[in-house]
Amino acid sequence: MNIVVLGAGIIGVSTAWHLLQAGHEVTLVDRQSEAAQETSFANAAQISVSYCEPWANKDAPLKALKWMFSDEAPLLFRPQFPIGKGWHQYRWGLQFLANCNDTAFERNVAQIVALGRYSHEALKNVVAQTGIEYQRLEKGIAHIFTDERAFAAAGDAAELMRRHGVDRKLVSTQELLRIEPAFQRFASRIVGGTYTASDESGDAREFTCQLAQRCGQLGARLLFNHDVIGLNKVGNTIDSVALRAQKTGQTSALSADAVVIACGSYSAPLLRTVGVNLPV
């Protein structure tokens, strides 16, 4: 198949790589001058299957209400008016609330953990195949707590992860200091922590840029500095992507048997133009 992948972040490039491995013809499109220039440029660097509890839980609605009045809140919902203009925001909010119960939480945890473990194995396979160097550290990930109540809650979360096969465990302050001696300078404030030996870290940008180069070497067409201006649909099928070259302003239609949308937060508005409502 002739497949067009929109977005050259870590998701788009990884998708392109696996499609090439499966024997497809791939064109990778991005508006930036090279891969990993937006969401994948600088992130937390964590590859942490053990921290994948969904934000939608029974305590989230009350917390979200409190957070609405804080500019530093981890979850913000800023209502758009008129409602008709931002209907997708309210639709997302209702879907979020519908998942704020124990039944949905357990179901979602199981699905996210399964996806995370699968993704982690896929990453290991790509690294083994390519030998990509991206400042990878396989030393696990530790989180520290300075509040007793938060530490107690972390114990419940760790137990939940262990039920799903993830090796996240509670550790004492002394165990934390053995894992990472740098914590010593503020050890008196630490009440405990969690540690997951199977988690790791690395530079997402380095990984993505190198994998994009490998995609090009395998025959992928890399179209950087191109804006996506539309999706062309015939019936229920997207058969081409409308592009504009930034350098010349020339527009073109890129034909495809299939299109992968990996544009981060821009995916939802792009797909709405063809009647697909992505809850992102």
Where do the PLM segments sit?
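Conserved Rossmann-like nucleotide-cofactor binding loop
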Residues: 11, 34, 266
